[in-house]
Amino acid sequence: MALSSLLRSAATSAAAPRVELYPSSSYNHSQVTSSLGFSHSLTSSRFSGAAVSTGKYNAKRVQPIKATATEAPPAVHRSRSSGKTKVGINGFGRIGRLVLRIATFRDDIEVVAVNDPFIDAKYMAYMFKYDSTHGNYKGTINVIDDSTLEINGKQVKVVSKRDPAEIPWADLGAEYVVESSGVFTTVGQASSHLKGGAKKVIISAPSADAPMFVVGVNEKTYLPNMDIVSNASCTTNCLAPLAKVVHEEFGILEGLMTTVHATTATQKTVDGPSMKDWRGGRGASQNIIPSSTGAAKAVGKVLPELNGKLTGMAFRVPTPNVSVVDLTCRLEKDASYEDVKAAIKFASEGPLRGILGYTEEDVVSNDFLGDSRSSIFDANAGIGLSKSFMKLVSWYDNEWGYSNRVLDLIEHMALVAASR
């Protein structure tokens, strides 16, 4: 079941245009035509009406769009008319709050309840309304009582339970639960939500044992009997669409990824104890901190053909939001950097529009604040050393983009359920 809707909304927008993903196949050496519409030819020297340097790839003609950091995809009609998908949120941290904020601008999803044992309704309203990174909430929010918020005229119930099994999701009307506490990240732990009547749980973090999905890459492998799923990490959501396009067109033999990642809540404001990661205990605003990440290896879980071919690391830097992936890879097929750019641009305008972006502008990190796409390829930041070895650079709003994908995955799951 294809994903019917991908939200493209900025932090200041009240509109929610949507796009549709088209089917795409796995990389296959014997393919004549790839999932992106490229046909391999020994004689053609045209790409979408424009010459490319090697003359090896011929793409279907597409209508070009302006390649900017915040280009919005076109709106399409929803394919489901069974009402809004009812969602509950467990954990009102960065992702929980942004998932709720974005959901209020969507016409396909309604958040009906939020659980957080450490935040009461008044403080919840304050944290939701004011955001140092994404700005003040543009809608209305009121506290009705200790257990009820009113957001844009609609009520959201507030619960304060430490044990997920005690949250009465069914009574609250929530069928899908976003597990964004950062605590219950395994199937066994997240399954506690099912005891309260939730039908499905979406973990907003990597999971050791839950099926992992990246919208635009492998969400079509989701099955209705999967009750607990993971939306992977923000970095995997950035890297996987990029790797998918490059691997399907040219083949990736091996690659090393570095993410230059904005500060997150797990870091220290000043030097402090961090027994598992000594460097991670150093002051976040004072240092560039090398760190480990499983994001690159996780790509092998959503793209099995890349399993064991990618690994990587992170540098935590003193910026509040927006991160960037640097993928240095060796290709199986000879291709110039211009060829790779052309393939990514084509995908960004068609099969992966709204997920993968493309820009040739001289952008910096703040230009992607509030960008809902998972990955925006920076054509002028990368470089090729040879026809099989190159560095690719792609930006992502690690908060806003990721939170959009959480909701997109939920809606895809709801569409699959509705089609049965």
UniProtKB/Swiss-Prot annotation:
Reported phenotype of the disruption mutant: No visible phenotype under normal growth conditions. Gapcp1 and gapcp2 double mutants have severe dwarf phenotypes with arrested root development and male sterility. Pollen grains show shrunken and collapsed forms and cannot germinate.
A Gene Ontology molecular function term of the record: NAD binding
The keyword Transit peptide appears for this protein: yes
Record: active site: 234
InterPro entries attached to this UniProt entry: GlycerAld/Erythrose_P_DH, GlycerAld_3-P_DH_AS, GlycerAld_3-P_DH_cat, GlycerAld_3-P_DH_NAD(P)-bd, Glyceraldehyde-3-P_DH_1, NAD(P)-bd_dom_sf
Presequence extent in this chain: 1-66
Catalytic activities: D-glyceraldehyde 3-phosphate + phosphate + NAD(+) = (2R)-3-phospho-glyceroyl phosphate + NADH + H(+)
Locations listed in the record: Plastid, Chloroplast stroma
Site description Activates thiol group during catalysis, residues in chain: 261
Record key words, sorted: Chloroplast, Glycolysis, NAD, Oxidoreductase, Plastid, Transit peptide
EC number from the UniProt entry: 1.2.1.12
Classification via Gene3D superfamilies: Dihydrodipicolinate Reductase, domain 2, NAD(P)-binding Rossmann-like Domain
GO biological process: carbohydrate metabolic process; glucose metabolic process; glycolytic process; intracellular amino acid homeostasis; primary root development
Chain sites annotated for binding NAD(+): 94-95, 116, 162, 398
Subunit structure: Homotetramer.
Record-stated family: Belongs to the glyceraldehyde-3-phosphate dehydrogenase family.
Name listed for the protein in its UniProt record: Glyceraldehyde-3-phosphate dehydrogenase GAPCP2, chloroplastic
Lineage, top ranks: Eukaryota, Viridiplantae, Streptophyta, Embryophyta, Tracheophyta
